[in-house]
Design a protein with these regions (language model features):
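Structural beta-sheet core signal
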Residues: 13-14, 63-64, 90, 175
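Short loop/edge segments at beta-strand edges and connector loops
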Residues: 16, 37-39, 66, 73, ...
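Conserved beta-strand segments of alpha/beta enzyme cores
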Residues: 32-34, 111, 172-174
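Conserved alpha/beta core of the MobA/IspD/sugar-nucleotide pyrophosphorylase nucleotidyltransferase superfamily
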Residues: 125-203
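A general structural signal for well-ordered alpha-helical segments in protein cores
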Residues: 20, 47-50, 76, 112, ...
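Short beta-strand-to-loop acidic/aromatic patch adjacent to the donor-nucleotide binding site
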Residues: 60-70
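Conserved N-terminal catalytic core of the sugar/cofactor nucleotidyltransferase
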Residues: 1-61, 152
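Conserved core of the sugar-phosphate nucleotidyltransferase
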Residues: 72-151
């Protein structure tokens, strides 16, 4: 949130599940935060959390990110600056293949054609850092895909990237190669490593 504020983003929706009351209390220190609770967090996934938040996007484009990734503020600033061209973007890191992370593959024109954890090393272009910028067109297409997945197909325990992967043939996404530090925090060991990487910052 601090990084978003530094980049000039003020209208923020946070979706929480586990210990939602603690998170909501923590967010009271900020202005302009809309909190949405996913009370079914134990049986759903992040696509369902986004589904709950979509009514707050009002048909506009938006930034989408996972809260377990910590990164430099300049990554968001760069993404928004690049967005002046009107593209939908996926922030990505080309420094190395990470087995457990989402990867992207691109077509011959450099546009993203696939996102998945299962993309092989000889086919991937970069690792996604789970930060996405959607223009209004892409946001609308993604919203319809998510509504269809959850309300019609009744598939509630899927990653958002499953829906993203399904819309690349309908709208254009380009990779945004980051310049800055980032780290995904899944456990206490990861948190300790992140504290070393971002030493001097508040995590």
């Amino acid at each position: 949130i601090d990084n978003l504020h530094k980049a000039g983003v003020k209208d923020i929706v946070v979706v929480g599940g586990y210990k939602a009351d603690v998170l909501k209390k923590h967010l009271e220190r900020y202005n302009g935060i809309t909190f949405v609770e996913n009370s079914r967090y134990a049986e759903t996934n992040n696509m369902y959390s986004l589904y709950l938040a979509l009514k707050h996007t009002e048909g506009s484009g938006f930034l989408l990110m996972n809260a377990d990734v910590y990164f430099d503020a300049n990554i968001i600033a760069g993404l928004l600056e690049k967005d002046k061209e009107g593209n939908s973007l996926i922030a990505c890191d080309r420094s190395g293949y990470l087995e457990e992370s989402m990867k992207i593959a691109t077509d011959e024109n450099g546009k993203i054609k696939h996102i998945s954890k299962q993309i092989a090393e000889d086919e991937y272009y970069a690792v996604s850092i789970d930060v996405y910028k959607l223009n209004a067109d892409a946001a609308g297409i993604l919203s319809r895909e998510i509504y269809d997945t959850i309300e019609v197909k009744k598939s509630e325990n899927l990653w958002t990237e499953v829906a993203l992967d399904a819309i690349f043939s309908k709208t254009v996404f380009a990779p945004y190669e980051i310049c800055g530090r980032w780290f995904e925090i899944d456990n206490h060991d990861d948190l300790r490593r992140a504290e070393q990487i971002f030493k001097g910052d508040v995590i």
